[in-house]
Curated annotation (Swiss-Prot):
Catalytic activity, EC: 1.3.1.14
InterPro entries: Aldolase_TIM, DHO_dehydrogenase, DHOD_1B, Dihydroorotate_DH_1, Dihydroorotate_DH_1_2, Dihydroorotate_DH_cat, Dihydroorotate_DH_CS, Dihydroorotate_DH_I
Gene: pyrD
Protein name as catalogued: Dihydroorotate dehydrogenase B (NAD(+)), catalytic subunit
Free-text cofactor note: Binds 1 FMN per subunit.
Annotated keywords: Cytoplasm, Flavoprotein, FMN, NAD, Oxidoreductase, Pyrimidine biosynthesis
GO cellular component: cytoplasm
Length: 304
């Protein structure tokens, strides 16, 4: 008998625990020719803002040992174009679409959450708190528990949809941040976002990225991500989504053991567009081969 791969994630019924990560899968349609969307649990759109954003100047992507740095700058079409141009595709897909979004003030976050709450094709929301708070001198929401709590509480009041908060690893104590977000009303937490890094061109003596710094993703960050998922899983009661360097079914299952109920596949999709589907299928094979009846039986089953 085939293992049960289904997951209930904060009210979202997923056919399996594999999702795609924001910023690596467009709005879903871009990858539909390469991935059978009905073979993955859910997909997460690239980050959305109230107004369109052109993003950062180039170069804004560079390969690094074991990963990549990106400084895309949250380029996106804005909420109006998203509703007019992207939502019709979501209506044709039988897989939950989760919209990642961000703002520069708690009020902007709340306004976006309210607008997205009105769209039936949007199954859930993922809040990107790795953005500067323009009202408080540019401090990044996701590095201050009070600021993060304000954003999450504002979004919680604006929507009844499942609310996932994406945590930054660029903090002193990720557990404190996780607790603040959970206490403010997050239904689930996804972690980790990218680590801040940079690359230098020795010949020109200049940064490779026009933005100087960028977000590091890929296999290089997996050990950090695993550690943070494990730490947070021991401290909060809400379900977790593990992110960071997942390129195989084995990687994904390690995150499940560490305490994640689901995972997101990001950078791997740039290398192999069908990576998320292949990882989901590989997880099912592993469970079958090892006599595990339900993937949920492995959540937090790490033996320490």
């Amino acid at each position: 008998m085939k293992p049960d791969m289904t997951v209930n994630l904060a009210g979202l019924e997923l056919r399996n625990p594999v999702m795609t990560a924001s910023g690596t899968f467009g709005y879903g349609r871009e990858f539909a020719d390469y991935v059978d969307l009905e073979k993955i649990g859910a997909f997460v759109t690239k980050g959305l803002s109230l107004k369109p954003r052109p993003g950062n100047p180039t170069p804004r992507i560079v390969e690094t040992p074991g990963g990549m740095l990106n400084a895309i700058g949250l380029q996106n079409v804005g909420i109006e174009a998203f509703i007019a141009e992207k939502v019709p595709f979501l209506a044709r897909v039988n897989t939950p679409a989760i919209v990642n979004f961000f703002g520069s003030t708690p009020e902007e976050y709340a306004e976006l959450a309210g607008r997205l709450d009105e769209i039936p094709q949007v199954a859930g929301l993922e809040v990107n708190i790795s953005c500067p708070n323009v009202k408080q001198g540019g401090i990044v929401f996701g590095t201050d528990p009070a600021c993060a709590g304000q954003v999450v509480a504002a979004c919680r009041r604006a929507t009844k949809k499942p609310l996932i908060v994406k945590l930054s690893p660029n903090v002193t104590d990720v557990v404190v941040m996780a607790q603040a977000c959970a206490d403010a009303g997050a239904d689930a937490l996804s972690l980790i976002n990218t680590l801040t890094g940079m690359a230098i061109d020795l010949k020109s003596r200049k940064p490779v990225l026009a933005n100087i710094t960028g977000g590091l993703s890929g296999p290089a960050i997996k050990p950090v991500a695993l550690r943070m998922v494990w730490q947070v899983s021991r401290a909060v009661q809400v379900p977790l989504i593990g992110i960071g360097g997942i390129t195989s079914a084995t990687d994904a299952l390690e995150f499940i053991l560490a305490g994640a109920s689901a995972v997101q596949v990001g950078t791997a999709s740039f290398i192999t567009p069908s990576a998320s589907q292949e990882i989901a299928q590989g997880m099912e094979r592993w469970l079958e081969e090892h006599g595990v009846a339900r993937v949920s039986d492995l959540v937090g089953a790490l033996e320490c």
